[in-house]
Amino acid sequence: MTTTHLMTPARPGLADLLDGIREQTRRGLDPRRTALAVADVLRAGMPGPDLLTDEERRGDADELISHLLHAESAFSVKALIWEPGQLTSIHDHIAWCAFGVMQGVEYETLYRDDGDHLTEIGRVANQVSDVSGFAPPGDIHRVHNTGDVTAISLHVYGADLSDSAVTIRREYDLPVR
């Protein structure tokens, strides 16, 4: 995954969202409740794809593109650009996450770790304006752009990603039952 650092405090459409996220992260809730509270902030003020420039909205058929839009000690905001057919490994995350779809559809498959195998526990087709939040443990998933247009999503992670853009804690190579 290629990540660019595009942090600009004056980015139109992001300031109010950052204020709302900051308010929720300062409440001292547990990670799951923080993720759900931040998801509510996204749901109320989800920007459109025009948050990004034309250049930033371009994907790469060979790899998932990620733009770090903002980072501070309590959270970071990234935009992910998914070309048709792109998918992640089955993975979980280093911290809570809330995300919303700005363009396209992201198909998400959810899993449970049963020791020697994974069990599929759900599937969701996240459409434009759909928002979700989750926190470890229990955040094992795979995301796939099954559509024929570029998908763009905005992700808020409960970690400072300014020094490391890595959000994946673990990738799973277990059989799925």
Regions found by a protein language model. Give the residues of each.
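A short, structured loop/turn motif at beta-sheet edges
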Residues: 126, 146-149
